[in-house]
Structures are given as C-alpha cells and as structure tokens.
Design a protein with these regions (language model features):
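Bacterial N-terminal signal peptides that target proteins for export
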Residues: 2-18
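Compositionally biased, low-complexity repeat tracts
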Residues: 8-12, 26, 190
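Exported/periplasmic ABC-transporter solute-binding proteins
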Residues: 29-84, 91-94, 98-117, 122-265
Length: 265
C-alpha cells in the first residue's frame, strides 16, 4: 500500500489543474444559483390566470423562474411599503402605483401602462335579471339580496364600482346591501356560491367563470379609466426587467386578449 508521501508526490503536478477545476465548478454553481433565483411578482388578483400562464411560458423559453403573489393592489402596495421582497408590481389602478412611486419604492423609469379592463354587473348563473345601464333604472329594486364588490375603501374594483353606482344614482340605496370583499376574485366567488345575488367585477373575471352570467357592462364614462400599470420595484433583480418586457410584448398580447383584457394604448 502506498504511503501518504508517495501519494502527495503523485498528486503534486496536478494540484494546479485540480484547483482550477474546483474554482470553475464553484463559479458555475454560483452562476446557476443566481440564474435560477426566482423573480417575485406582486400582481392584482384579476391578472392571476394570464400571468401564471405567461410565467410558465417565460421559464420554458429560458427565463428565470417566476413566483407570484396575487391579492388586491392595495394590500400588495402596503406589503411592498413594509419591505416585502417584490421585484415587479402590477396594479389594477394607478392610485396604488402612485402610492409606491411617491415613496420611491418603484423604478419610475420602468413604469408603463400595461392593460385596460371593463366593469360588469354579474349574477349567479340561472339567476339573472334584466338591467338597463341608464339613470332612472331602478337597479336596487331589480334584485332583493346582497351586492358583492371589492371593498370600496381600498380595492380598485370596489372603488370603480362605487364610482359607477354613484354615477347612476344607485349608491345610496345599495351601500347598505354591499358584501365588501378583500379583492375582486373574492367578490366573484361570493356570486359564484350564490351568497350574493349580484356582483360588480371586471369583465375578465366574469369570463374566467362558468358560474356567473354578465347582466350588463358599465359604460366607461361612469367611472375612472381602468388601467393596469406595471413597474419594477426598487432593488429588483435583473431578470425582472426581462419578465416585464415579456408580459408587455406582442408575444404575450394574445394571452391577454383571450382573457378579455384590452391592451393599454
């Protein structure tokens, strides 16, 4: 059996080669780890279905892994303010993007209007009723139960809903019958389960559900424009810029349109 000294003499000439190989392996491992580190996207609940599909496609095309946190824009903005590690924020209104911009929590130069949406009145499937979107129509008298909306105090869909109800003169009669939800998808679920007799959600949410029927579309003049801005957060990882570019690209446009979104001008 060879002694330790003999073994050292044999390895000696190869010591430099082995060291270089080890260093290269460590660099490669570090590079792979950095490349695979996920991008964290905070996005409005109404974008859930499309962004999950686009995230998977982005990864299959060689992009960094993407993980999502979907909730109301207000909740997400406050979480970012409190230090939550988000790389990209997609809001369902300009107010909450402005909120972060005023606090220097997004990279203003990357901010862009990504999408637009439409507000609709829905009911559980099989329980629809006639609705006319004009002043003088008695919407409060057209149904007896609860009206599901995003919380008008902070949820964008609820804020738009309140504006639309005020526009037509229905707010005072209906505000005591509201079921206020934490986000627009939660409001939709209340209608799907029959816990609310009607709801105000985005057209894209209604399209994603087989359990509700659209009764009418609120005209755009009845509320502020429904615009979805997106921006990189302060300190975002480099891969996040590529994902922002991807979701706003022509390659992603068909997925948005298929879900009922309108591309921002």
């Amino acid at each position: 059996m060879r002694n330790r000294s003999a073994l050292v003499r044999e390895i000696g000439p190869w010591r430099g080669v082995l060291l270089i190989a080890l260093l290269l392996a460590l660099v490669a491992t570090g590079s792979t780890a950095a490349r695979e580190r996920p991008i964290t996207v905070f996005a409005a609940a109404s974008t859930t279905d499309v962004l999950q599909r686009l995230g998977g496609r982005f990864e299959r095309d060689g992009g960094a892994p993407v993980r999502f946190s979907f909730a109301s824009s207000s909740l997400l903005a406050r979480q970012i303010e409190e230090g939550a590690p988000a790389d990209l924020f997609v809001s369902a209104d300009e107010q909450w993007m402005d909120y972060l911009q005023q606090r220097s929590l997004i990279q203003t130069a990357t901010r862009r209007d990504l999408l637009a949406n439409v507000l609709v009145l829905v009911a559980p499937k099989g329980r629809g009723f006639p609705v006319t979107m004009k002043r003088g129509f008695d919407l409060p008298g057209a149904f007896r139960g609860r009206l599901a909306v995003g919380d008008p105090a902070h949820v964008p869909a609820g804020i738009y809903a309140k504006e639309a109800l005020q526009h037509f003169g229905w707010w005072e009669a209906l505000k005591g019958r509201l079921d206020s939800a934490d986000n627009v998808r939660a409001a939709l679920r209340l209608v799907e389960m029959g816990e609310a007799d009607a709801g105000i959600v985005y057209a894209t949410d209604a399209m994603a559900s087989s359990k509700v029927v659209v009764l009418a579309e609120f005209p755009s003049r009845s509320h502020a424009p429904i615009v979805y801005p997106a921006a990189l957060c302060r300190g975002a990882r480099p891969g996040a810029a590529a994902f922002l570019a991807f979701i706003g690209s022509a390659k992603a446009a068909p997925a948005w349109r298929e879900a009922g979104f309108r591309l921002a001008d």
